[in-house]
């Protein structure tokens, strides 16, 4: 038999879990138009004591591929990530290929992380080409037949990508559970002039948000009912 206090505690816990899940759903919807974004799911389970517990999981399903006019844009066909490095030497992995020519001519993410080991684009580059295997070539004029190789956009995979740690800004880091990044060779997965769209499903997200709002309202009503019953029982005893 549950006491008033245990019912209130359980409902407060469950409401807190629902608010946390609602925050993730809201973040997914906010990133609906973010290139390469992977939906973050807050999976809930009801334990034997009636308390909700949750686990955070990223959905790595590939989003749709869209063609762009930017030669620095790349999409990954299939599984894998592109390593990027911050100014402080921090290594992360992304599928957001909305790159640019940044400081000192290096190929960078939109927020200034170096792509791979550093790919410097020459100042006299007339044409910039990224081949399907990731090799990068620069042409100094429109009559060049064979450009100069200036680097490679690396592709890596993990033994258990589901256990990567999401650190924000479309970046992930390796964990002990995910295993170390393994360089993929002899592939044709890089598509220049393309970007991967977010894999967030707008319909599912809005539907989840509506259901959670209803659940939150119901949970708060239960607490109000229990509180009223508790106050009445106190008054009866005192009467």
PLM segments and residue spans:
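Amphipathic alpha-helical polymerization modules
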Residues: 1-239
């Amino acid at each position: 038999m549950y006491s008033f206090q245990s019912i209130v505690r359980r409902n407060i816990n469950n409401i807190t879990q629902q608010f946390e899940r609602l925050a993730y759903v809201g973040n997914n919807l906010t990133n609906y138009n973010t290139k390469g974004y992977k939906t973050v799911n807050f999976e809930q389970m009801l334990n034997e004591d009636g308390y909700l517990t949750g686990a955070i999981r990223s959905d790595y399903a590939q989003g749709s591929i869209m063609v762009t006019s930017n030669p620095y844009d790349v999409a990954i066909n299939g599984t894998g990530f592109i390593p990027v490095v911050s100014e402080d030497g921090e290594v992360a992995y992304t599928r957001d290929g909305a790159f640019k020519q940044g400081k000192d001519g290096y190929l960078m993410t939109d927020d200034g992380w170096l792509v791979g080991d550093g790919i410097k684009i020459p100042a006299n580059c007339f044409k910039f080409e990224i081949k399907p295997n990731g090799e990068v070539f620069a042409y100094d004029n429109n009559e060049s037949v064979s450009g100069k190789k200036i680097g490679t956009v690396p592709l890596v995979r993990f033994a258990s990508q589901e256990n990567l740690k999401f650190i924000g800004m479309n970046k992930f880091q390796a964990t002990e559970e995910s295993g170390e990044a393994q360089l993929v060779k002899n592939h044709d997965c890089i598509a220049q002039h393309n970007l991967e769209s977010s894999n967030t499903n707008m319909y599912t997200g809005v539907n989840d948000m509506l259901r959670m709002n209803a659940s939150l309202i119901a949970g708060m009503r239960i607490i109000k009912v229990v509180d009223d019953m508790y106050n009445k029982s106190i008054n009866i005893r005192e009467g």
